[in-house]
């Protein structure tokens, strides 16, 4: 095939028909469909993908843009490169060529190492730029790869925009950075236009937030270092380094976010907390909780992203099976008593509570919450926030809510004796109380209440049940494979319980869909313990933790590790992941 030839829709359709991937009818449909002004700018593969055709060689699979890109890569004999933005070194990639050269030729550097540079394009036969680039990059070799048109059109302008924003901020003078820039940022709410450097910071902050939403991050970490700061995202419970930027640029980014969160920009010596509202790329309103911390190299900022889909997520999506769902719903239908959800920070406790309250919050009941902070605004709850500045704690909040004629009270966390006692008083006076504790498993919550100073007979009289939970990463459905089981690890996980050992289980591999991690998304595993008469008697008699666990086992209550083992058998997660997350004692 001849170089310097730009593929068009006609060429693609003829080749697809020749290869038996589309029918004559499909070709005619695409050729005779009118394109509007915007669609005329599309790449041929994007226009063909628009019709959602079936791949005639694999009738069960649609001809989406990725599949069409794979076909074109095979056709022209080039590898298809899928950009993983989490692993891209934007500074290095954009230094390969100027933005003008990249935009003019519709190419992008996607990987750089000492011997060669990978250059991505969506027009594999247009190569009149190669000789010029080889000359400027010698002695490094150039290797051509094919990019999906969607990826090229997104990351080509985005990479250069981010790089330009960082460099513009880096080149500002010390006076501009420390004074003029911050003053201009403070005026962003007015009608005045900030200078160029500050506008770059605004764009950089927007890119960080939108990128975090797209990647499904739960937390954003902005971490200062001596020379270069780091931007990290927590995705599926694991931190990924996204970007390195000069320390002064990161400082300006943090200042911008502090202003948006209404924090004191000048105060960098003590921790601060705040919130900001923004919108996701899908247009959903979401909130971020901000927390700053003074460190040796400057102020560190962590943003916790509250998932706007939390309140519309079903229990099945959270990981509840049919039996657990019935038990949990029966427990939450009680008119009074205490229900606890336990687990470490980030284990999904708040999501479970919100989902439960959403079902309970009908027009016939008054649902009140006291939280620190309010994690998700919901119109069917009456939500109240703890405020240490005015001495409004959880215990004070519960005391105030008791005078508001509540039916159901949600206490964000029982962390001291006063809060525990107020929750018990609320339960004794005819209210249903839902709250959280930080314990490793369900039986431990009983001894934890005792440690907080709650009288055992009061715990026995008011506690209805406990749900302990963890979040495990789900295996990527696109690449998981069966492999032989590690018998020793399986026996370690299921000790003292009779669960048949399978010969093979699914494990992680890694592909473009899961960023080579082998996992995509997370799901809950649960240990549910309802307090029957025997357990209540043990609690009243101040039984130790081993006695409580023994009685729970007699009742058929299965620990978290067994719930994890069942998820392994279902092919949902891996043995290594469950062993990483659950307590084995």
Swiss-Prot record:
GO terms for cellular component: cytoplasm; plasma membrane. CDD domains: PulE-GspE-like. ATP binds at residues 346-351. The keyword Zinc applies. Disruption phenotype: Disruption of the gene reduces transformation rates by two orders of magnitude. Natural transformation is undetectable in the pilB-tfpB double mutant. The tfpB-pilT mutant makes very few T4P. The pilB-tfpB-pilT triple mutant produces no detectable T4P fibers. GO terms for molecular function: ATP binding; ATP hydrolysis activity; metal ion binding. It is found in: Cytoplasm. InterPro entries: P-loop_NTPase (IPR027417), T2SS/T4SS_dom (IPR001482), T2SS_E_N_sf (IPR037257), T2SS_GspE_N (IPR007831). The keyword ATP-binding applies. Zn(2+) binds at residues 476, 479, 511, 514. It comes from the Bacteria. Keywords: ATP-binding, Cytoplasm, Metal-binding, Nucleotide-binding, Zinc. Belongs to the GSP E family. ATPase component of the type IV pilus (T4P). Acts as a molecular motor to provide the energy that is required for biogenesis of the pilus and the extrusion of substrates generated in the cytoplasm. TfpB is required for optimal T4P extension and, consequently, efficient natural transformation. May play a role in initiating T4P extension. Both PilB and TfpB are essential for optimal T4P production, with each motor playing a distinct role in T4P extension. Overexpression of tfpB does not restore the transformation defect of a pilB mutant. This is Type IV pilus assembly ATPase TfpB. The gene is tfpB.
